[in-house]
Amino acid sequence: MLFIFRVIFVVIYCIVVCVLGCLYCLFSPRNPKHVATFGHLFGRLSPVFGLKVELRKPADAESYGNAIYIANHQNNYDMVTASNIVQAPTVTVGKKSLLWIPFFGQLYWLTGNLLIDRNNRTKAHGTIAEVVNAFKKRKISFWMFPEGTRSRGRGLLPFKTGAFHAAIAAGVPIIPVCVSGTSNKINLNRLKNGLVIVEMLPPIETTGYGKDQIRELAARC
């Protein structure tokens, strides 16, 4: 019964947020400040899943400038856990297929996020170039999942290098975000599903790193 209630509530909540969000974003489409706003709204669903989310971040985190945030990508619950710590103006880089999710895909695009075609290496490299150019033009940060896919309980997967190439090319720091494990932890028929810690670590400077040191930088993160 609890499972059914949660599913119905979450579906209705998400549809309402996405529909009203799309209408709201039409007044300032592709504004990167929207991502944090709606990320936090989705983050409010964490208690519905029986989760208590504890945010940890450096005292000066609000004053960070342009950066690339990298986080571990576990499953769909990242949307109600990691989203709570997103800071404006930060946009995410997601797979192009997200656009086809009803309501959510349209909101994802209107809030200013970048879509990448992972099956086309040329277009993927073009997206990285777009990230670098965006840093040069305005105050903005990017959120990436360097594993490239959801780990689904397999631990931290090997990092792909796109985020690190972009950070070095743009000369911006990398800010790691760590989310404690949620895989095989959440039972939708259970009232309480425990504590999830989302921790933002201090920035890692990329100045001094060259293209031939990508793996060294990734290992440091």
Name these PLM-found stretches.
Residues 1-26, 37, 59-62, 137, ...:
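Membrane-interfacial terminal anchoring regions of lipid-handling membrane enzymes
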Residues 48-56, 125-126, 180-183:
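Short gly/ser/thr-rich secondary-structure transition/capping motifs
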Residues 55, 69, 92, 198-200:
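Generic preference for hydrophobic
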Residues 73-75, 147-151:
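Short glycine-rich anion-binding loops that position phosphate/pyrophosphate groups of nucleotides
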Residues 103-106, 141-143, 152-216:
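A cross-family acyltransferase "interaction/gating" segment
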